[in-house]
């Protein structure tokens, strides 16, 4: 039986972080957590991290698609915050962002990890951006590091 598992140290990886400016007071903490994890735990040089700001979470997939198509990066981390309001807008933005990012990831065989919060209120967002519930940006970075290694191992098997 063959088993593929991986660690999180990927010194030579290039990663793109796409971050929404909307709800930036939350997203900046997610970004900080992601960069800290990539550099401190993943041992990635800051010069190998491209950070792109977009207006909102809805705009993340088009930039992710462009980056994935360049074939220059090993992973993409999506960072945004969608807080439920009084309309269905929340659901549409979240569903479109997640489904489009998933489609892009499988189309281009590039890990795209989700540091996108979908919360009921601002308090939940604050809790998930570095306080009581951890930092989802950091968790997305950890997932990206592991997935980079897994994808490298899969490519070796098939070559």
UniProtKB/Swiss-Prot annotation:
Keyword Transferase listed: yes
GO molecular function, one term: 6,7-dimethyl-8-ribityllumazine synthase activity
Amino acids binding (2S)-2-hydroxy-3-oxobutyl phosphate: 86-87, 128
Active site: 89 (proton donor)
Role noted for this protein: Catalyzes the formation of 6,7-dimethyl-8-ribityllumazine by condensation of 5-amino-6-(D-ribitylamino)uracil with 3,4-dihydroxy-2-butanone 4-phosphate. This is the penultimate step in the biosynthesis of riboflavin.
Classification via PANTHER family: 6,7-DIMETHYL-8-RIBITYLLUMAZINE SYNTHASE, 6,7-DIMETHYL-8-RIBITYLLUMAZINE SYNTHASE DMRL SYNTHASE LUMAZINE SYNTHASE
Subunit structure: Forms an icosahedral capsid composed of 60 subunits, arranged as a dodecamer of pentamers.
Protein name per UniProt: 6,7-dimethyl-8-ribityllumazine synthase
Organism: Buchnera aphidicola subsp. Schizaphis graminum (strain Sg)
Gene that specifies this protein: ribH
């Amino acid at each position: 039986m063959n088993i593929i598992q991986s660690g999180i140290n990927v010194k030579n990886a290039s990663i793109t972080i796409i971050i929404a400016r909307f709800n930036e007071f939350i997203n900046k903490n997610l970004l900080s957590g992601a960069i800290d994890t990539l550099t401190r735990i993943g041992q990635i040089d800051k010069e190998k991290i491209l950070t792109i700001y977009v207006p909102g979470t809805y705009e993340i997939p088009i930039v992710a698609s462009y980056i994935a198509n360049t074939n220059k990066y090993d992973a993409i981390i999506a960072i945004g915050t969608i807080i439920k309001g009084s309309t269905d807008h929340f659901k549409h933005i979240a569903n479109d962002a997640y489904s489009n990012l998933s489609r892009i990831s499988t189309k281009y065989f590039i890990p795209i990890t989700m540091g996108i919060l979908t919360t009921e209120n601002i308090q939940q967002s604050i809790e998930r951006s570095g306080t009581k519930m951890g930092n989802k940006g950091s968790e997305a970075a950890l997932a990206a590091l592991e997935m980079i290694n897994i994808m490298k191992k899969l490519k070796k098997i098939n070559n």
